[in-house]
Design a protein with these regions (language model features):
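Short amphipathic alpha-helix that is part of the acyltransferase structural core
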Residues: 1-25, 113-147
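Active-site rim helix/loop that mediates acceptor-substrate recognition in acyltransferases
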Residues: 18-38, 140-163
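Glycine-rich acetyl-CoA-binding "A-motif" of GNAT/NAT acetyltransferases
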Residues: 44-47, 167-170, 228
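Acyl-donor-binding surface of acyltransferase catalytic domains
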Residues: 47, 51-123, 247-248
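A conserved beta-strand-loop-helix scaffold within acyl/acetyltransferase catalytic domains
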Residues: 50-53, 149-158, 163-183, 187-191
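Conserved acetyl-CoA-binding loop-helix of GNAT-fold acetyltransferases
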Residues: 64-76, 190, 196-212, 230-235
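Conserved active-site alpha-helix within GNAT-family acetyltransferase domains
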Residues: 70, 87-103, 201, 224-242
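Conserved GNAT acetyl-CoA-binding A-motif
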Residues: 77-88, 211-223
Length: 251
């Protein structure tokens, strides 16, 4: 049995190999869980990261025996479910070999087609100022986790504010994912009383266009139940060929 041991620090070299093994970039939602996660490592080459009772990342150098390592892991460090990208085939295949149940819970957008959206001259996007933060939080409470998160994104220069006819109608974010800054996760939220007017698509389209003009790659995602966000992203040219998957372990 592989002896998994809890360690203080993420094994950087192994993690780099894991990210390089994926055919598509990491998801920001999972990256945030990894950043604050509980790390376990096993000597034969691999690691696991947990957020509470959820496994949020798993990697084994010996991919052909990944299901055996995964089976050993749950005996040594029990967990109730796994969060996984559908393009993480090693983990998906290992879970299926163990008879675990897979449920799709989110759309991951890693491809974008060229689109031109019509917008009025009164709509524009600009970097947030400190004075914008209270309104950005109030208008996006169902998107941001906390005031502190809004402030953190602002301090990193990744918070944008959308205005139409001089009033704030929403906000957008750009979060570099892979460490190089070339892949950037973007997101948007529209002020509640300004929704269903097309502003979400305009925000995400402007963010994506700006990144692409700098030679960067915008990616994004949304919950499978959030059909409004899915429609807005698709209108902005994004195509979802992948899913966020929850894997459940039978009792």
């Amino acid at each position: 049995m592989s002896a998994f041991l809890r360690v203080a620090d993420l094994p950087i070299s192994l993690r780099s190999q894991y990210l390089a093994s994926l055919p598509e970039p990491q998801e920001w939602f999972l990256e945030e869980l990894v950043r604050t996660g509980e790390v376990w490592e096993f000597p034969c080459g691999g690691y696991a990261i947990f957020h509470g009772d959820t496994l949020v990342e798993f990697y084994a150098l010996d991919s052909t025996n990944a299901h055996r390592h995964l089976s050993n892991l749950i005996q040594q460090r029990p967990f109730r479910k796994v969060l996984c990208k559908s393009f993480d085939r090693v983990l998906i295949d290992a879970a299926q070999k163990l008879g675990w149940a897979l449920v799709e819970t989110g759309f991951l957008f890693r491809k974008r087609n060229p689109v031109i959206l019509t917008k009025s001259d009164t709509f524009h996007l600009e970097r947030a100022r400190a004075i914008d933060l209270p309104d950005a939080w109030m208008n996006g409470r169902d998107f941001y986790d906390s005031k502190d998160e809004v402030a953190q994104i602002f301090r990193s220069g990744d918070l944008w504010i959308a205005f139409n006819e001089g009033q704030m109608v929403g906000s957008g974010i750009m979060i570099p994912i892979d460490g190089s800054g070339d892949v950037v996760d973007i997101g948007m939220v529209t002020r509640p009383d300004q929704r269903n007017r097309g502003f979400a698509s305009l925000i995400v389209s402007d963010l994506a266009n700006l990144l692409e003009s700098e030679g960067k790659r915008p990616i994004c995602g949304c919950a499978e139940t959030n059909l409004a966000s899915k429609a807005a992203l698709e209108k902005a040219g994004f195509v979802s060929e992948h899913r966020l998957v929850e894997i459940y372990i039978p009792d």
